[in-house]
Design a protein with these regions (language model features):
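Lipid interaction determinants
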Residues: 1-86, 97-227
Length: 227
């Protein structure tokens, strides 16, 4: 069954949902912190379905690491990659705050964004305030032709020939011209410390292809196109 058949035969709207003005694909225009600093360079994508969120955060393209065999990455390159962010989590709206359930699937081994968001929409701009006042984010809805809104959460992806679990957990969101995909790791990685655990692990694993593949066997992708 493909997505077009799924839409035709099983299209449904859940009983509970975030507001319609929160749905779609947003890119972050800026984040300003309480210390006065503002970041307008980091590439941040937010895709929102009725009940869950996909998030991707990458440095500017010039600072992104080029693909190569695992054993060829330097410690410096591994540390850049270990700072990438991608995650999927259930979201709950109470009329003022958007809360994310403890991040279900994340490249990082700890939750970097623990606060809920106070959200307000103005035209194509959505403002997110942290309740503590630590930061404010300016999100911009990306233009799109009318199209389907699909939100599917992944239980697991399994190789039908070998029965091997390739990915466990994640999700797919399609909203008009855009799509986002998260594929979780097949096995849980145990963090030995509360913060920056992934960075610590990749330093130790530098040159070890098997370990690095295990740590980075996680995907977050955003694309533009048509189903």
């Amino acid at each position: 069954m493909n997505l077009s058949e799924l839409l035709t035969q099983y299209s449904q709207r859940p009983d509970q949902s975030v507001p319609d003005w929160m749905l779609g694909y947003f890119k972050r225009y800026s984040i300003s912190f309480a210390d006065g600093k503002t970041d307008v360079l980091t590439n941040v994508c937010w895709l929102q379905s009725r009940n869950f969120t996909l998030d991707l955060r990458l440095p500017i393209r010039a600072q992104q690491v080029k693909s190569k065999p695992w054993e060829d990455y330097s410690v410096e390159e591994l540390l850049v990659m270990a700072d990438y962010e991608g995650w999927e989590a259930l979201s709950e709206w109470d009329g003022e705050l958007l809360k994310w359930c403890e991040t279900d699937n994340s490249l990082q081994l700890h939750n970097r964004w623990i606060e809920p968001g106070i959200l307000k929409r103005f035209g194509n701009c959505m403002i997110e305030l942290s309740p503590s006042g630590a930061y404010v984010e300016d999100w911009r809805l990306q233009p799109s032709r009318p199209g389907p809104l699909i939100g599917l959460r992944l239980i697991e992806e399994r190789n039908v020939e070998t029965n091997e679990v390739c990915h466990k957990g994640g999700g797919l969101i399609i909203c008009g011209d855009y799509a986002g995909l998260v594929l979780g790791r097949p096995q849980e990685i145990n963090a030995r410390q509360q913060y920056n655990a992934l960075r610590e692990l990749v330093i130790e694993a530098q040159g070890n292809s098997k370990k690095l593949e295990e740590y980075f066997k996680f995907e977050t992708s955003v694309a533009k196109g048509s189903i």
